[in-house]
């Protein structure tokens, strides 16, 4: 059941990326004469839902240096002015433009204090993802969806690299007994993707002039149930949170030469 839910979420993201066609391996890098920019915000509207926390029941001296004994699942981060962080904003079905060059911090996954940093990653299709563990405990990165890996990290500062050949959504969890750990990796077929900052702001630069569909994608914040699982490495039964499907919003945007188009998205718990 868990695998089916995650595969469905990956399919939803892939559909948003490529529409009804095939993955955009035919994206072409072209010279840009007078490109434009798309900028805007993603903001929350209405009361904030109650976001459940998770008890830290393994390696508290490593996972819980502040002794809070609970961990925020980091699924919905809303700033004081209502900006929603960790929302992926991208152009749908763009066929040509600038070369892909995603920021380095978004291509490197660290396991630190038993959480994944960053929580949302962008990795170019066919590029290399590097994964590190800064923790002095056993973590096992379990990945499914667009990529399927099960990678143990028994040593501190160990780095493992894997190529990500398939566009889509890869769910990341820990199979080392830290059931609250979760992250999402978006393997992207072109460079016009970004992730909102802590204020909910985003910007896409060097966009060829034209008409586009722009998508805001959020991983979803509701825990629909807890599911019992057996952790092979720790030989323990654990409870894993199972999350609701991602949320997707779409708009149309016109980009002019040397112009900035402003697009804002509003999210809510409906």
Describe the residue ranges of each PLM region.
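Extracytoplasmic copper-binding redox domains, predominantly the cupredoxin/blue-copper superfamily
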Residues: 24-270
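Bacterial N-terminal signal peptides that target proteins for export
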Residues: 1-9
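Bacterial N-terminal signal peptides
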Residues: 8-17
